[in-house]
Amino acid sequence: MLSSGKAMRMKSDRRQTMNRSKIEWCDHTWNPITGCLHNCRYCYARGMARRFCGDIRLNKLAKDDYKVCESALGEILYVLDEPMTNETGNAIVYPFGFEPTFHRYRLDYPTKLKMGNNIFVGAMADIWGEWVPKEWINEILDVCRKNPIHNYLFLTKNPKRYRDICVPIHTENMWYGTTITCEADIGNWNYLPAVGKRFISVEPLLEHIEARNNVIFDWIDWIIIGAETGKSKEKVTPHRQWIMEIVEEADRNNVPVFMKDSLIPIVGDKNMRRDYPQGLKVQKISEKMHNKLYDICYRCGREMKKSDMIALLARSVRGEQPKQYGFMCNNCFREHCKEYGIEIPKLKKMEDNINE
């Protein structure tokens, strides 16, 4: 890890930061903050952080490579403005294990995705924990505001922090969720924003939750259900009836249900649900990508995908490479050819449209 008593940094190294997600209900996970102090028995993230932390003792000796601050409650927090790397130049993803860490260099990653995605913010942390400085959260929210093509999904066990920080609620792409694992957690939904997009994650489902006529279903836009995973001796496998009662009540209230793969052994493939709210089905694109993919029909002026139109090319002398100067939709291209007595060329795209 150390070279001459100091951790090496590599500004160009941006690996292991924003990944195509293995979490079924989102496209990407974005982890500008890692680490958590909830100490949940079933936490998968803690185990992952321990696997990819390197030698924490040596990492902490590289004091020039990170900053330290205290939370409002007095806990030690770490700040990385650049990724910490080992002697081979590879990023140490969690150099302080599961201790709360702000990876500031990861803040710009949503800008690198040109197509709109459903991004789970903070899969390796609870970014709304009481120990997380308000300034960290505001920096993350500011990035979300500046990159509105994505849907941002937040999940916490401390939803009252949503109200403490006055999160933006009048935007369709900001989704605020809370985790409910047992009957004692039900009250958490009361702290979700009064308006805006709200969801709950019942994962892991640890006991029977009274779902029938529960007012929570009047307030949420989506529900995710999953079972505890891993090999813990204390692992709880939910009963099928616990799951189906939640699903049935969600159906009665027209709340989309997403069931994670961990439920397949319990309910069976045929009973699995992969429902998404409408707002998470629509993919937006950046202005730069829009200009790359779309253009105006030269004749009728209708905007369409370039791939669905005929490219117009011209050259002034034989042997010159033709230059593209515009596009024309299939119908307009046919009319154009007829109008000028030009034989309509046999193009695959036009033949496919005729066959359809």
Protein language model annotation of sequence segments:
Residues R51-C53, S307-I310, E339-G341:
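Short Cys/His-rich "knuckle" micro-motifs
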Residues K323-L347:
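Short metal-binding segments enriched for Cys and/or His
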Residues L37, R41, Y298, N330:
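Cys/His/Pro-rich metal-binding microdomains
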Residues Y44, G301, F333:
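Cys/His-coordinated zinc-binding microdomains
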Residues K6-M174, E183-A194, R212-N213, F217, ...:
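Conserved Radical SAM active-site core
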Residues Y294-P322:
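Short recognition patches in nucleic-acid-associated and regulatory proteins
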Residues G47, M304, H336:
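Cys/His-rich microdomains that often coordinate metals
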Residues L2-H28, F52-D55, L206, E210-Y294, ...:
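Auxiliary Fe-S-binding modules of radical SAM enzymes
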